[in-house]
Amino acid sequence: MPDFSYRPTIGRTYVYDNKSNKNLGSVIKNAKRKKHLLEHEAEEKFLDPLDHYMVAEDPFLGPGKNQKLTLFKEIRNVKPDTMKLIANWSGKEFLRETWTRFVEDSFPIVNDQEVMEVFLVINLRPTRPNRCYKFLAQHALRWDDNYVPHEVIRIVEPSYVGMNNEYRISLAKRGGGCPIMNIHSEYTNSFEQFVNRVIWENFYKPIVYIGTDSGEEEEILIEVSLVFKVKEFAPDAPLFTGPAY
């Protein structure tokens, strides 16, 4: 007969059925995962009506090659509660020197390239260390040719300059600015009217004011440049010659 008496020296074996038991951690994780999926589905359904709308991408980061032409770098003092004009397009001698360098050296334009858009890019830097303020900017794209802009204006509804203290303005006219082709021949044939007839006829000529939200007079390093978005076409002839091409 079997001996059912209790003896501490004899161990006992228990067999557990794990079919009805689950790990507590996995139960909590699965519950959170299901909750997250339900919230995600509800959020997507809420945003479904937005599929009928289109959002324009930043053309500055779009396809094409950006060619930068630095117009000038200079230091200017800006007094509190005021904004100063930083770009004056009436200097013919200044434009002559700039555009000569632009076409001949730093910006080689050929006939198989197309200028799709022009950006005015303004970089601002404080010259004095340990200064804590933000840059302000205000611009207008269209103005009468006979209008003489003021050198200094009061701050009225400005916008803060964004990341990296860079203020970028698209000069393309509404409806897609007219692309410029054969720009080198236009420059060669009529230089005196090149800027006014070619560039400003197809793109806006802006006026820009810069200021700060500081309560003191600040010294600012300003770099103004034009960035041309160039579209390149496939060449007619292969780039390489040889038995493999």
From Swiss-Prot:
GO CC terms, sorted: viral occlusion body
Q: Which Pfam families match?
A: Polyhedrin
Would the keyword Oxidoreductase be found if you checked this record's keyword annotation?
no
Answer whether the UniProt record assigns the keyword RNA-binding to this protein.
Answer: no
A molecular function annotated in GO for this UniProt entry is:
structural molecule activity
Q: Spell out the InterPro entries in the cross-references.
A: Polyhedrin (IPR001746)
Q: Which UniProt keywords apply?
A: Viral occlusion body
**Family statement drawn from the similarity comment of this UniProt entry:** Belongs to the polyhedrin family.
Its job = Major component of the virus occlusion bodies, which are large proteinaceous structures (polyhedra), that protect the virus from the outside environment for extended periods until they are ingested by insect larvae.
Name-wise, this protein is: Polyhedrin
- Species of origin reads Hyphantria cunea nuclear polyhedrosis virus
Taxonomic lineage is: Viruses, Viruses incertae sedis, Naldaviricetes, Lefavirales, Baculoviridae
